Amino acid sequence: SEIKSAHLKEDNLAYIVYLADNIAAFADRRKKEDTEEKGFDLSVPLQSVFNVLNGNNQRFYYQPGDMDDQGKINYPASEKKPFSREFYMKICQRMLDNFRGMNWSEEYLNSLLAVMEANLSYMPSSTSNEELSDISLFDHVKLTAAISSCIYDYLNENHLSYKTELFDKKDFYDRNAFLLCSMDI
């Protein structure tokens, strides 16, 4: 990985995000059954999570797009419309334009979240031919951020080095660094 060759300070947040992304990818990526395909396909659209739920074997896809300002919902359909390089470039440019006008402070976190949701909700997090493409990039990024926040708090609470604990040592996965809570109100 590129992080190995990077000359980063011991407390660089990249170490936290690197591990959090690996944990999130493990949680949201699943291998396709009965496939021999290798490599990546950047044109693959986001698939519906209901394709394989409860033993289903369906093929429904979201159309390349974003959250519509008009309130139209992008329902999955049987037609598989590929993503294009131009579509990815359009999304990148729109996000860059939004980021330029953003005040990077705690008050703008909801604005950042809204920009990410609007642009990445129908983009697959994985374009691997070996994996299902049914988790959006928005959901993957949001999960990565949540895990990063937990790791950050854990390391700082325990006065631990980011690089040593997350990258040099190999036992962080065995630590009780997370607490998952669920409740109904």
Residue map of PLM features:
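Regulatory/sensor and coupling segments of signal-transduction and defense proteins
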Residues: 1-185
